[in-house]
A protein has these predicted regions:
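PLD/PLD-like phosphodiesterase catalytic module centered on the HKD motif
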Residues: 1-33, 55-132, 136-148, 152-178, ...
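Acidic/glycine-enriched edge-of-secondary-structure segments
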Residues: 5-23, 44, 193-209
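N-terminal carbohydrate-binding/catalytic regions of secreted carbohydrate-active enzymes
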Residues: 32-35, 41-56
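Structural alpha-helical scaffold elements that stabilize or flank donor/cofactor-binding regions
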Residues: 35-36, 222
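An anion/phosphate-binding loop that grips the pyrophosphate of nucleotide cofactors and donors
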Residues: 39, 226
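Glycine-rich anion-binding loop/nest that anchors nucleotide
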Residues: 47, 232-234, 325
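Aspartyl protease catalytic domain
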Residues: 155-157, 161-217
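Beta-propeller domains
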Residues: 206-222, 228-250
Length: 372
């Protein structure tokens, strides 16, 4: 019997992997509802898109149980389109409607971020001790149709950082702080690394001017020192990331593999595939059919039936895992995002098994990536 690769647990860290196409099913819908039901005193929920009935019902139970201890913030619309035309994670605007339908509107705050940027987080903080995060939205698509990974982490220190970030998004000036960092300003610093058992976890956030490009800078630095890279990404279009990948991994001998979403890659590519103004040679990997594969996903539909390859995942040197809400695109730098950089051979092995399942499935039954 093949080993069950859908769930990994080590001490206070639990990882739930999901892909219906690759037959990896950790039942994240149930685990998310159980996480919410486990709240005894307080629950903070920051979510880009919420439509899943089981999750909404669990939040309704939490409202009855916790009263003022429940607070939800959600993305309330993208606002005007950005001049670049580059977007991320399209969605129908139903979250607010459903929150009201389930009687949760008095516990919820709509977040409007100016300039077409997104409140793109997907995390919960429970009782100041536990964090739920990952790549998946709380939707039918995010929990049952897409490729996603979710984490439940017990750590008071990590919970404090996420709670502070949550409160920052409620600040009246939050929506207007998403602008490029002053180049003369001090470089952003990551939050302190926390240990969960033997796993070192460093959280990164993009929540405004003080942390602008914090996550991107850390990811590029990690790639610059890596010799082996595995990427599972909805899209791959950040200039800094693309440049280091071209410089260090475009050689046929380089140890790199990737799983991407063909439809969403068009959002970040230059003509004829897309409308980006980035140099075509940065997308060398879309022609590398041996090392990069595309998921047989479909383009966005207004209903909650989107089946994107939705991970935002990198595994480096069998030691480091990068995952969270942060797409590897330029747009992510000015969204509200969170990502984790974890150092642990055991965690990296679990994520590699998941990656390999996706890669093998899409190598056989995938969809070609767009080329330029």
């Amino acid at each position: 019997m093949a080993p069950n690769i859908s769930i990994f647990q080590a001490g206070g860290l639990r990882v739930y992997f999901y892909s219906h196409r690759a037959n990896v099913n950790s039942n994240p819908t149930k685990h998310l509802a159980d996480f919410i039901d486990g709240a005894k005193k307080a629950l903070l929920c920051a979510i880009y898109d919420i439509q899943d009935q089981s999750t909404l019902q669990a939040l309704k139970r939490a409202a009855t149980r916790l009263s003022t201890g429940l607070h939800i913030i959600y993305d309330a619309g993208k606002g005007p389109a950005r001049k670049t035309g580059v977007t991320a994670d399209p969605k129908p605007s139903k979250s607010g409607q459903l929150i009201k339908q389930y009687g949760l509107d008095s516990y919820a705050t709509a977040v409007h971020v100016q300039g077409g940027n997104l409140m793109h987080d997907k995390f919960l903080v429970r009782d100041a001790v536990d964090v739920w995060t990952g790549s998946g939205n709380f939707t039918k698509g995010g929990l049952t149709l897409q490729d996603n990974n979710f984490l439940a982490i017990t750590s008071a220190a990590l919970s404090q950082v996420y709670a502070d970030t949550f409160r920052g998004m409620l600040h009246p000036a939050h929506g207007s702080t998403h602008s490029p960092k002053n180049p003369k300003g001090a470089p952003p610093k990551p939050h302190a690394t926390v240990k969960v058992g033997a796993v070192k976890i460093t959280p990164y956030f993009t929540t405004g001017v003080n942390e602008f490009e914090d996550a991107e800078t850390a990811i590029v630095k990690a790639l610059q020192g890596a010799k082996k890279v595995r990427i599972a990404a909805m899209n791959l279009g950040d200039p800094g990331i693309l440049q280091v990948l071209k410089q260090r991994f475009s050689s046929p001998q380089a140890d790199i593999r990737g799983v991407l979403d063909p439809g969403q890659m068009r959002q970040v590519m230059p003509p004829p595939a897309g409308r980006s103004k980035q140099p075509a040679d940065l997308f060398w990997f879309t022609k590398d059919h041996n090392r990069f594969v595309g998921a047989p996903s479909h383009t966005f539909v207004p209903s909650d039936n989107n089946d994107f390859m939705h991970n935002k995942l990198m595994i480096l040197d069998d030691q480091i895992v990068i995952t969270g809400s942060y797409n590897f695109s330029e747009h992510a730098e000015v969204n509200d995002e969170n990502t984790l950089i974890m150092q642990s051979p055991a965690v990296a092995k679990a994520y590699t098994q998941y990656f390999d399942a996706l890669f093998e499935q899409y190598k056989k039954n995938g969809k070609p990536l767009p080329i330029v």
